[in-house]
Amino acid sequence: MSSHSPISVHADAILGEDIVMGHGVIVEAGVEIGDGCRIGHHTVLRTGTRLGNKVQIGDQTVLGQQPMRAANSAVTSNARHEGPTIGDRVRIGSSSIIYAGCTLSEDVFVADLATVREDVTVGRKTIIGRGVAIENQCTIGAFCKLETDAYITAYSTVGNHVFVAPGVRTSNDNFIGRTEERFQHFKGVIAEDGARLGVGCTILPGRRVGKDAVIAAGSVLTRDAKPETVYVGVPARAVGPVPPEQLLQNQD
């Protein structure tokens, strides 16, 4: 291992070979770091974090953050989570936070300033763009693209090959923060394989975007979107089929 001292590595940490750590890195108890990893300046690997081989992490990033529950939080638990699992060749940018209890599969890319909350699973080769926020208890499939400042609400499911454009917004609370009844009805969104969400569109709680469906830029989806159908407007309405050449089955 080579480093720019000072760094702090707990005696219980397990380190592979050919690891490079920047200035001020902190490695807590129970951390495992695979071979060939590169860790940027002032990054913190909290208790139980597990890195595969050839993982790259930028500066001032935190892995293994435990959730903090506000006194009136609706969807965050006080339970402690095991450290995150980071697959081989994952790349994580600077000033990002990867919470405990999440899994990033191999070859995932996480850009700067992104947040991935607890109990989240991200499939292989998915891209999480700059400033993206994925809330707790979400499943993100493989080969997805979540672009700058997209927001994935808690309890959501995103399939494989899903495209989420910049500034997409999702919600899980139809009661908009009022009444005790809302606690029984929290429900995230579902985007099936090949769904595409245009720039700045909004998907309301519990709505399902069918396979290969398209939600146009700026639209507000208030009901389920049928597969292979284009939706436009506020509220979004079906305007026709997705062109055959754009369907997932016809891509290389």
What name fits each language-model region?
Residues 2-70, 74-232, 237-238:
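Structural signal for interior beta-strand "rungs" in well-ordered beta-sheet cores
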Residues 235-247:
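C-terminal end-helix/capping segment
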